[in-house]
Every structure is written in structure tokens, then in C-alpha cells.
Amino acid sequence: MEKAKPNYFPALDGLRLLASINIVMLHLGSSSALAYMSDYKWIMPIVNAPAFAAGIFYVLAGFLFASKFSDPERQIPVIPFMFARISKLYRLHFFMTILMFLVLVFKFSGYTHLPGFSEIGDCFAAGLAKMTHPWRSLFLHITLTWSIVPDLGMKLNEPSWSLTSFFVCYAVTPWFSRWLFKQSNRTLWVLFGTLFIPGILWAAFFGLSDNLWFDSYDAKYRFFHIFAPVRIFEYLFGMVLFRLYKEGFFDFLKRDYVGGISQFVMLAAIYGSLFLMRPELNPGINYFFHHSLPILLYGLFLISLLPGKGGVARFFCIGIVRKIGRASFYPYLIHLPIITIAWGICNLNCPKNTILLMIFIYTVSTLYSEFKVWRRKKAKAKLQENSAK
């Protein structure tokens, strides 16, 4: 029996890179490292909104996992699958959380120089005394529970909240991927629309409620933004997109020029959506413009890239872009501690230092990713060698 050819979409590696860079630039901006760009009114919304927010990672992951588990007969043990996926990123999350904790202890200590050996104890005690629930915060981040109760602790390595919601997504992946194969095309299109309902209701609740039990609007927004059960529907939307793609509903994108035109239109729509949010609108409406609407646009942009045609898709398929893109979730986890440390070394608010920092983050991440690939190939070759004896 001939083995089925696996689904592979090279341009999506470049999409990962684009989304990752946008998130890193967002946090550079929030740390005041991009103040020199403040006069560029047509660029800053891309960074500050951002144009490609965390939701794109969920749509992309849902699509890719649906493609990997496209065999309806494949049985996937849920618990091993969940922990296998999380373990690939948790080790890095753990070390970055510890690093960020130590960096914040030093920052809050008031020391302006690296403490000598005899000063370490005093520096540590002074920093802890000025932090809010430091040990509880560390525990919440290490156990991936901070995103559930973010108001109970400080934010350490904040982007790690996504690991919690991905853990929930992975829990339903085996079941939902098998269930999708049993559904008719009509049901798939119904799902295409109805999966947005929870996010819209969440936006309405956000806009119609007061600050609830939160101390401030910002604390409330952070909770609504990282709430894992809502993020799962973005992931499922990505899975539904793959099934619709496999059923041939997007084959028209394979025609000459159609893919390129579609990519241009979707990028223009994503950019235009950034200007829909306005201070005078109800917060729930702005939340919808920032969370629900982009998910649809991200999904359609993703679909337009799949045939590999068009200028954007061809750029995303360049070897070096794909190589860096495959490692792009590592910058997502490591950039905040590195930005915090960099501010203690130099002034990040200048173009040269911004570029150098980005080069450092993505070089380290790519080398780490390539090392893991090399180690995996080496272990596989050794296993094959031993089995051949």
C-alpha cells in the first residue's frame, strides 16, 4: 500500500516569522524602545495594535495540526499527545521564567551595579521586598496557571500565557480532528461561522460589564485577552479551515495571479482593520475589532498563501525565511527577559540597537532550533543503526 503524501505548506513558515516579529516589536514598543518611530503614524498601528496578534498562532496551529492528523483512522492517545507537545516548549518557558524572576529581583533591588558575592543576599532581599507576591507569581508561572488568575501575581514572562491555552487546545485535538472527518461540507461551513460566536459573546460581555473584581481596566482586559477557553475556538477555526481546504473550496487560489491578488487584499484588510478601533467606541466593540475580526482575516490570509503563488507567498518560501520561521515560537518565549536585560545594558530607543537586538533574538532562536533538529536526526540515525545490527 502506497504511503500517503504528508501535507506540507512551505509559505506558512514565513507566516510564523511575520507574526513572531510583530509580537516582539509590540513588546519593544511597550517598553518605550520604539519612541523614535512615534512620528510614523502609518507604521505604528502595525506595531501597537498589533497587526498580527497572538490569535494568528492559534489559527495557524489549528490548521497545521489538522493537516498532520488528516488520517481519520489514526488513533492519537490524548494524554501523551498533550504532554509531548507542551514538553517541547515548557523547558524553555521554565528557564525564561526563572531568568525573568531574577532580572526583576535585581531591577527592584535598586542596585545600579552587579552585586558582588557578599552583596547577593542583600540585593535579593531588597528586590523581593519591593515585588508583589513574588513567590506566588513564580509558582503561578511555572505551573502555567498565571493566565487563569493573572490578578493574583505579577507578570513575569508574560507571553507564556499562551502555553496554558495551547494545553487546552491540544486536549481536544485528537477528538476534534476525527470528528471533523465525519462532517458534511455544509456542517463545515456552519462551523466556519459559528466558531466566532463565543468570541463575539466574550467581546459583548467585556463591553457591557464594569471592572468586575479587577482593580483596573487594564487588569480586566488582560484577563479577557488571555482567557484560554475562548482561545480554543480560534484554534478550532484553523482546523475547520484545513478541512475546507482539503475539500477543494479554495482551489481557485491556485490560478495564476489569484493568490497574489488575494494576499494583497487580505493584507490591506488587516491593515485597514487597525483603524477601526477608536477611544470613543464601547470597549466591547474595540475588543471585537481587535480579537474576533482579525481571526477571520488571518484565516483567509493563511489560505491565500497555501498554493505558494504570489509575491508574499514566494518570499515566505525562501529558504532562510522558512528556517527562521520554523524557530519563531522561541523568540515569542524569550524576548521579554532579553529586552529587560538589554535595557540595563544600553539604550534600546535607537534604530541600531533595535536591529541588533532583533538579530540576536532570532539568531539564537534559529541556532537552538537547528541544534534540536540535528540532535533528533542523530538520535534517529543511531536508533536505525542499532536496529540494523
Label for each model-derived stretch:
Residues 194-204, 215-233, 239:
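Loop-centered beta-sheet repeat module
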Residues 171, 178, 236-251:
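Internal transmembrane alpha-helix with an interfacial aromatic "cap," most often the third helix
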Residues 79-83, 135, 221, 233, ...:
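Alpha-helical membrane-protein architecture signal
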Residues 1-211, 311, 327-328, 345-389:
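Membrane-cytosol interface segments of multi-pass membrane proteins
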Residues 235, 259-375:
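Alpha-helical transmembrane segments of multi-pass integral membrane proteins
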Residues 40-47, 216-226, 283-291, 349-354:
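Non-cytosolic membrane-interface motifs at loop->transmembrane helix junctions
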Residues 11, 51-52, 158-166, 224-239, ...:
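Membrane-interface micro-motifs in multi-pass membrane enzymes
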Residues 183-192, 251-262:
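Membrane-interfacial entry segments at the cytosolic side of transmembrane helices
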